[in-house]
Every structure is written in structure tokens, then in C-alpha cells.
Regions:
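Acidic-basic catalytic patches of nuclease active cores, encompassing PD-(D/E)XK
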Residues: 1-45, 56
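Beta-rich catalytic cores
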Residues: 48
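Conserved catalytic cores of phosphodiester-cleaving nucleases, focusing on short active-site segments
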Residues: 52-54, 60-68, 86
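Catalytic cores of nucleic-acid endonucleases
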Residues: 68-117, 124-125, 138
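Short, low-complexity, polybasic intrinsically disordered segments
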Residues: 105-172
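A hydrophobic membrane-anchoring alpha-helix module
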Residues: 174-181
Length: 181
């Protein structure tokens, strides 16, 4: 199930990677396929999942989803399903109650900023803007969570991050890659 973060970031539609990182992660899509075979479900519903799972040296765990395309309402709806299904799959393999999972499981959505300049950025339909996000974060001294995904913070994830590719690299990837050396 282990692969590189680069491989999990591949966008089939546009035939491109969202990161070049060789950091080793669990391919959560492959884990989902294994889970689906195990439960031998007779329903027509296919499970969906986030792209990667990374377990940090400090016991923090990160579910990572890459979105290279435009994030519209249908995409947001699918992100919600991916989170619910991913938690179910995670609980199947890591038998823990939700309270224990919430104490160290985090979620990161990495999106393509260029393709999402004019989209609603929050569930209050404020248009997405990098400068507004930075201003809001510095004034509030906390994370600005876009696309309505703040719903999951403290519900099934400890923290939720919505970051463009550059923010993701600076905020997490550089630190993780140093720890892996």
C-alpha cells in the first residue's frame, strides 16, 4: 500500500502530478479497494476515499486529498463523502473509536489555486482570495478553512487545512521530508 506522495497526487484527467515529493505515504485509494473486496458488499454504491495517509514521527496522522481541477459544489459534495468513507475505512483497519481518532487525525485538501480563483471559498459564499485568506488567518490567529470543510474540524478530524500547492509544501512537506531523512 505504500507509495510516494507524488504518485497519490496524480490527476488522471489532466495527466499531471500536484507534487514531486518522494515522501512515502499509504495509498488510501488502494486501501479503499482492499476494504471494498473484504466487505463483499452487494450494494451498487462504490466507496470513495482521500488520496493518501501520512503518519508523522510525532504520531500525528494526515489524510491528504489532492484536487487539481476546479472546485465546484459537486466537488465539495464529493469531498464530504470522501471524508465520511475514509473515516469508515480507517476505523476498519485501525480499530479505534472516533474520539481517539479525532485526537491525532488531520485532514489536508491541497488544491490548484490557478483553477480556483473565482470560486466561493467558504460556506458563506465569500469568493476565494489568497490575500483575504492570509489577512483572515493573521487577524484571527487561526486557520481559514475553505469550501465548507470546517464542518469536519473537531467532528471527525483534529484539524482541517485547505492549502494551495505552495502553502502545502511550505507548511508541511518540507518539515516531513526533513523528518524522513
Amino acid at each position: 500500500m505504500k507509495t510516494t506522495l507524488k504518485e497519490t497526487s496524480f490527476d488522471d484527467h489532466n495527466q499531471e502530478y500536484m507534487t514531486q515529493s518522494t515522501l512515502k505515504v499509504i495509498n488510501f485509494d488502494k486501501l479503499k479497494e482492499e476494504f471494498f473486496k473484504k466487505i463483499n458488499n452487494d450494494t451498487n454504491r462504490m466507496f470513495c476515499s482521500n488520496d493518501a495517509l501520512f503518519i508523522c514521527n510525532d504520531d500525528e496522522i494526515y489524510m491528504i486529498e489532492f484536487k487539481n481541477g476546479k472546485i465546484d459544489q459537486n466537488t465539495i459534495y464529493n469531498l464530504f463523502w470522501k471524508n465520511f468513507d475514509s473515516i469508515l475505512i480507517y476505523m476498519h483497519y485501525k480499530v479505534q473509536d472516533i474520539e481517539r481518532i479525532k485526537s491525532n487525525l488531520n485532514y489536508i485538501l491541497v488544491y490548484n489555486e490557478e483553477k480556483n480563483k473565482d470560486l466561493p471559498g467558504t460556506n458563506q459564499s465569500i469568493s476565494q482570495s489568497n490575500s483575504r485568506n492570509q489577512l483572515g488567518q493573521s487577524l484571527a490567529k487561526k486557520e481559514f478553512i475553505q469550501f465548507g470543510l470546517g464542518y469536519f474540524k473537531d467532528y471527525i478530524f483534529k484539524n482541517v487545512y485547505t492549502l494551495n500547492k505552495s502553502q502545502f509544501e511550505h507548511r508541511f512537506l518540507k518539515k516531513w521530508e526533513l523528518q524522513e531523512m
